[in-house]
């Protein structure tokens, strides 16, 4: 499994992941994890390379849970006005087989509470 080096959590209190469902304008594509919750939650990740027709190869980060499902039930709620990123409140449980994230859409914010 090839790991994305920015997933060392030292010095970061939270980070965001862009859910790639084809509609970048929808704010609910963004989910924000507390790093401790993420580290303890049993997630695994791998880096994949995908090429479509004549397009450049796209690096895809795939997150999956060791149980086979992804459970999203503890998301912090916060509005980062400067970056215009909205932290989505998802306190209900969501079970997703696989989440695919484009690496170019992954943002890490240091120093947030």
Swiss-Prot record:
Further remark: Partially overlaps YLR283W.
Record-given protein name: Putative uncharacterized protein YLR282C
């Amino acid at each position: 499994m090839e790991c994305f080096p920015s997933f060392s959590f030292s010095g970061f209190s939270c980070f965001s992941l862009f859910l790639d469902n084809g509609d970048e304008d929808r704010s609910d594509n963004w989910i924000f994890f507390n790093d401790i919750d993420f580290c303890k939650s049993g997630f695994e990740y791998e880096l994949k390379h995908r090429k479509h027709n004549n397009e450049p190869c796209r690096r895809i980060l795939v997150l999956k849970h060791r149980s086979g499902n992804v459970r999203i039930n503890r998301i912090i709620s916060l509005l980062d006005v400067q970056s215009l990123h909205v932290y989505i409140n998802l306190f209900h449980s969501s079970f997703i087989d696989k989440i695919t994230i484009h690496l170019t859409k992954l943002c890490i914010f240091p120093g947030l509470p």
